[in-house]
């Protein structure tokens, strides 16, 4: 059988059509961030936007601006930084063994002076699980949480997951404080262990005197009421707020003068293929499409540099996969053409479209949700680039309803989409037949005589027998084996890149704009955009 060329170096070692597992090793940190003290010529406050009509309950807040402020009012057990490493907050440790995660708590206090206990964590866990928030989405593997003692919580899982602890960034509130009312029957926001607390009139955040970082330079957060998206846009554009964050999920980017930092999101942009299609079921064709695309171009011109080019299936910012992912980021015409000719598409018709000996043409339709302008732009870039190799792609811009209907019915060839990967880096729903985001995926047929040729490899780190065994496993089987502890991330990455069930393009980033007088804005992440607020300083 002819040898298949692909663009990767194989090392042996829910669909979001529009967020961010724990490293159980020494890369995790429980150290408190450094604290800045206000100096002469600086101010001790920040001004931010909020919605007075919305709540500061982290499990019911509806607006993005209030949800982000909740990260200052309520601390989680742990956070992940912008490279998906764990930084412990209220937890001293989070140890995952098999189907159980044991969390040990630090000695910390709520803003009312009462001590944090395991019962508060269990209460918050149950709220998170039943909420309509990202926290419920992340905790899909968690079955229950119980208090072993006042400082220990045990979380039962439905399967083993070495990176489960990365999902434990749900806000911790004082047990029952979300249901208490005042003498007028008004329910106020719950009590947290955050860096700040609400003042009595609930229109300003002030220092929580029971927080270890209380001596930070920033003593209060002054709030401006922005009741709707139009008001938010206005205040951002005129610079009324010192900081503003957007995940750009709708494709619209607000501009604010000053500085900005990109926030890594675990949102994969990819091309999905209907593997029931005779042509697209050919691995060589999917490899050709992958190698023919310039991922840097898509990030630059499609997403205005608010994305990281994907060198594999997992987020390239994740330290654990930096040495095991190596899809080419720029287009490789030679490899693309070789792959196409290997499967018989070695002629061009009068329109420049590749055909095989039977007259079959490489003509496809690429579905895209027309309601997201960034994705539409990316789809057009993809079509233009592939046309250079004789692959004709018609971009079909559909309404969200029509787009999802086509995917659900299987009435498509190619589609451009975005999926939010949970912080435990679980991509099984995307690549496993029957998965919630696995449109067009089916278990590939194994051929005993099929071989692949890896290009660019200079050395082998596994025996030929081991490589053959890995290649005989499908990506879905390797995912299952990874959680069972029989396969490594290197194994999984290798087979994903060889099998190419979908074509990864890039991982989107959000953006945090901030006043150019603010210093030390470091390691802001989707887990906490104010990650380093204890070290902020603001010039006058």
List where the protein language model places each region:
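Detector for C-terminal structural segments
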Residues: 292-324, 374-383, 407-540
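Append "and occasionally in soluble cytosolic enzymes with long acidic Gly/Pro-rich linkers
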Residues: 282-383
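Aromatic- and charge-enriched surface segment that lines or borders ligand/interaction sites
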Residues: 90-132, 279
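N-terminal lobe/hinge region of extracytoplasmic solute-binding protein
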Residues: 48-96, 126
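Ligand-site clamp/hinge motif
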Residues: 207-253, 392
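Gly/Pro-rich hinge or "lid" segments in bacterial periplasmic/extracellular proteins
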Residues: 166-220, 230, 333, 338
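C-terminal motif of bacterial Sec signal peptides marking the signal peptidase cleavage site
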Residues: 17-19
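Surface-exposed binding/hinge segments that line
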Residues: 95-96, 137-179, 197
């Amino acid at each position: 059988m002819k040898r298949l060329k692909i663009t990767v170096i194989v090392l042996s070692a829910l669909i979001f059509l529009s967020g961010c597992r724990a490293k159980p090793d020494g890369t995790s940190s429980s150290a408190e961030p450094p604290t800045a003290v206000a100096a002469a010529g600086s101010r001790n406050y920040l001004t931010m936007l909020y919605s007075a009509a919305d709540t500061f309950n982290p499990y019911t807040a509806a607006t993005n601006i209030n949800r982000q402020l909740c990260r200052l009012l309520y601390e989680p057990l742990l956070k992940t930084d912008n490279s998906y490493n764990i930084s412990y907050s209220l937890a001293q440790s989070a140890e995952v063994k098999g189907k159980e995660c044991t969390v040990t708590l630090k000695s910390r206090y709520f803003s009312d002076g009462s001590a944090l206990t395991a019962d508060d964590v269990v209460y918050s866990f149950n709220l998170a699980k039943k909420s309509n928030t990202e926290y419920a989405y992340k905790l899909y593997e968690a079955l229950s949480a119980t208090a072993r003692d006042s400082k220990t919580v045990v979380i039962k899982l439905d399967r083993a997951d070495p990176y489960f602890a990365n999902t434990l960034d749900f806000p911790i509130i004082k047990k029952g404080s979300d249901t208490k009312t005042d003498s007028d029957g008004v329910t106020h926001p719950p009590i947290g262990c955050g860096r700040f607390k609400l003042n009595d009139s609930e229109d300003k955040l002030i220092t929580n005197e029971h927080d270890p970082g209380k001596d930070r330079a920033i003593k209060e957060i002054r709030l401006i009421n922005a009741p709707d998206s139009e008001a938010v846009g206005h205040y951002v554009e005129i610079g009324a707020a010192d900081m503003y964050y957007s995940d750009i999920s709708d494709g619209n980017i607000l501009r604010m003068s000053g500085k900005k930092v990109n926030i890594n999101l675990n949102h994969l942009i990819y091309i999905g293929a209907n593997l029931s299609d005779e042509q697209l079921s050919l691995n060589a064709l999917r490899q050709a499409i992958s190698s023919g695309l310039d991922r840097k171009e898509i990030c630059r011109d499609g997403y205005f540099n608010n994305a990281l080019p994907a060198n594999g299936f997992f987020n390239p910012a994740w330290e654990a996969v930096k040495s095991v992912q190596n899809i080419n980021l720029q287009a490789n015409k030679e490899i693309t053409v070789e792959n196409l000719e290997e499967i018989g598409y070695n002629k061009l018709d009068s329109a420049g479209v590749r055909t095989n000996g039977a007259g079959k043409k490489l003509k496809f339709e690429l579905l895209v949700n027309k309601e997201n302008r960034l994705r539409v732009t990316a789809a057009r870039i993809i079509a233009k680039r592939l046309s250079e190799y004789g692959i004709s792609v018609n971009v079909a811009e559909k309404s969200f309803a029509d787009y999802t209907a086509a995917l659900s019915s299987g009435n498509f060839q190619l589609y451009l989409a975005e999926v939010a990967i949970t912080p435990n880096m679980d991509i099984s729903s995307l690549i496993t037949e029957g998965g919630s985001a696995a449109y067009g995926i089916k278990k590939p047929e194994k051929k005993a005589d099929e071989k692949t040729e890896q290009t660019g490899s200079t050395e082998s780190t596994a025996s030929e027998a081991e490589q053959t065994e890995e290649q005989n496993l499908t990506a879905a089987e390797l995912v299952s084996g990874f959680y069972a502890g029989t396969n490594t991330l290197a194994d999984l990455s290798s087979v994903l890149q060889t099998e190419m069930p979908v074509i990864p393009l890039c991982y989107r980033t959000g953006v945090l704009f901030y006043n150019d007088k603010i210093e030390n804005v470091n390691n802001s992440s989707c887990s906490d955009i104010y990650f380093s607020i204890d070290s902020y300083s603001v010039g006058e």
